[in-house]
Amino acid sequence: MIWYLCLSNCQFSLQCFSCYFLEGFIMISSTNFIYLALLPPLLAPIFIFIFKNNQNLRDSVGLIGSLISFYATINITNDLMNGGSPNLYLFNIFSDLSLSFKVTPLGAVFGLLCSGLWILAAIYSIGYMRGNNEKNQTRFYIFYSLSIFGALCVAWSSNLLVLFIFYEFLTFATYPLVVHKETDESIKASRL
């Protein structure tokens, strides 16, 4: 019966199995994919802090978040390439100025780079941080995740005010990464 319903609705498309189960649910739009791309790096620090005493869980939060964010960014880029205009409106600041995000072709490329490299860097940083017995690994992962959030927001900012806000956010989020080792050299480098 499931296949009969699907065959009549989809005519043998790859969505046959999912159309039966997803019927009546909200389909994921490009706006929801922007949420899906931005929420993992924003929420991951909370879970990283919660799991700070369990290295495996703490480190897997960053990796899972990077995979979700990359998946959403691929779908956003796909929507843009198919003629869509992915955007996310949050609220008005002034009458003509809003806190919103709009994905442009260059922003989509930058978003793919950020979220794609986040996966590789997350895998590498787990081995590097554990192999060198680095201190404050939880702090590193929290601010690394927030930096990815800031970079995606900069890439998809819809106006100069949003760009400025999240560029400054990115500046403050990367500062603890620069001074992570807390040596005189790293503190001196952070002052530049």
Where are these regions (language model features)?
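Transmembrane helix-loop-helix hairpins at membrane boundaries of multipass inner-membrane proteins
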Residues: 17-33, 47-142
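Alpha-helical transmembrane segments and their immediate interhelical/interface regions
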Residues: 27-46, 158-174
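Juxtamembrane transmembrane-helix termini
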Residues: 44-47, 120-123, 172-182
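Transmembrane alpha-helical core residues of multi-pass small-molecule transporters
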Residues: 40, 65-68, 117, 147, ...
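Alpha-helical multi-pass transmembrane bundles of energy-transducing inner-membrane proteins
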Residues: 139-192
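Cysteine-centered motifs
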Residues: 6, 10, 16-19
